[in-house]
Structures are given as C-alpha cells and as structure tokens.
C-alpha cells in the first residue's frame, strides 16, 4: 500500500500544538526535567505512566509556537517519532506494527523527498532508521512501565494538585496526576531504593 510513498522531512510540530502532555520514558527524565514538569498518570487499568506537562489548560501546548516550532532544547521522543508510530498487532502480545499518519503533509507519491521503499520493495535507510528509533523507543517504554510499577508497588506516588496564579491574576488548579512523595522516598530503606 505504501510502496510508492515518499517522505519530505518537514520542520514543525503542528501536530502537537494542542497536546498539553506527552508520554515521557524514564531514560528521558534527566534531560526532560530541565524543561518540563514530569508527573504520573494512571490508565483505566491502574497502570502508572509518566508524562511531561506542556500546557496549563486542555488543548494547550506552551512549547509549540504558531509556526510549529518546538521552543525547548529537548523534544520528547514521543514527538520526535512522528509521523511514525507503533501499534500493537498480531497474535503475539509483544508484536507491533509500524504505522504512519497518512495526514502528514510530508508524505507524497510525487517522488519528492526520500522513498520509504526501494524498487525491489525493500525498506530504505530512511524507513529503517524510523523503525530502529521506534524499536528503541518501545524498549524504553517497557522499561519505564516496570519502573512505574515499582514506584506504585513501593507506594511512592501521591495525588497532587498544582495551584497557579498567572501574572494577570487568573488562578488555575491542575489536578488528576501523581508525583513522587519526597517524604516516602526519604523514608525508604536503602535496599528497596536500589531495586
């Protein structure tokens, strides 16, 4: 289906301009925490996951400007993988399918940019690089899931609400997330912390 597809690398993160939080892998914490608050959410199955907060309101990303430029030194891998994503698929639980956002403006059949497949139908370097990035990203997601499960098991997370007063005087309250309790972390036995 996509054998004749070409991709132009377009600068810009317009696709994320209304995204107020993004998944962040544990391996990214050190770099991401310099620019974004990192908090934890829970899915309907009570699985804990980390996110970088990008906005104070729904559909607000304070890091993407009107031209689609990301105004931060570090861009989360979740955004950098676009327009490619992995979707669970197949009989195996750990089997994933590489998917694309067909609405991405850089995709075309006019042979502009780089082909995703060569004349023999094999993946080109550009697609191989995207697939390698996705595989690496998914490995980090799995490690992050284990890390977050440990945080929950050690009861280190607590609900938090952030109360913010804007320079205009407007007051905002952001809740529905968790953070690591400093008191519980300090009280943790050294052996448990090493786990």
Task: Report each predicted region and the residues it spans.
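Short, extreme N-terminal leader segments that mark the start of a protein/domain
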Residues: 1-54
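Short, basic/low-complexity N-terminal boundary segments at the transition from targeting/disordered tails
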Residues: 14-18, 59-62, 67, 140-146
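Short linear motifs in intrinsically disordered
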Residues: 26-31, 75-77, 151-156
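Short beta-strand-initiation
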Residues: 33-35, 74, 81, 159
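Short, glycine-/Ser/Thr-/acidic-enriched flexible segments
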Residues: 43-45, 79, 179
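Detector for glycine-centered tight turns/loop "hinges" at secondary-structure junctions
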Residues: 45-47, 68, 169
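Aromatic- and glycine-enriched beta-alpha-beta binding-site module
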Residues: 49-117
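A contiguous, surface-oriented mixed alpha/beta subdomain in the mid-to-C-terminal portion of proteins
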Residues: 86, 91-195
């Amino acid at each position: 289906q996509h054998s004749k597809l070409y991709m132009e690398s377009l600068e810009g993160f317009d696709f994320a301009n209304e995204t107020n939080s993004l998944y962040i892998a544990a391996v990214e914490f050190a770099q991401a925490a310099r620019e974004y608050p990192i908090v934890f959410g829970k899915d309907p199955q009570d699985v804990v996951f980390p996110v970088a907060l990008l906005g104070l309101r729904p559909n607000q990303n304070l890091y993407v400007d009107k031209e689609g430029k990301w105004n931060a030194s570090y861009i989360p891998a979740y955004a950098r993988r676009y327009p490619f994503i992995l979707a669970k698929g197949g009989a195996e639980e750990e089997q994933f399918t590489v998917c694309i956002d067909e609405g991405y403006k850089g995709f075309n059949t006019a042979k502009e940019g780089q082909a995703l497949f060569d004349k023999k139908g094999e993946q080109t370097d550009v697609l191989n690089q995207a697939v390698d990035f996705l595989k690496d990203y998914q490995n980090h997601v799995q490690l992050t899931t284990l890390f977050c499960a440990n945080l929950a098991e050690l009861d280190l997370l607590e609900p938090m609400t952030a109360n913010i007063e804007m320079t205009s005087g407007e007051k905002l309250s952001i809740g529905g997330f968790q953070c690591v309790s400093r008191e519980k972390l300090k009280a943790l036995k050294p052996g448990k912390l090493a786990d």
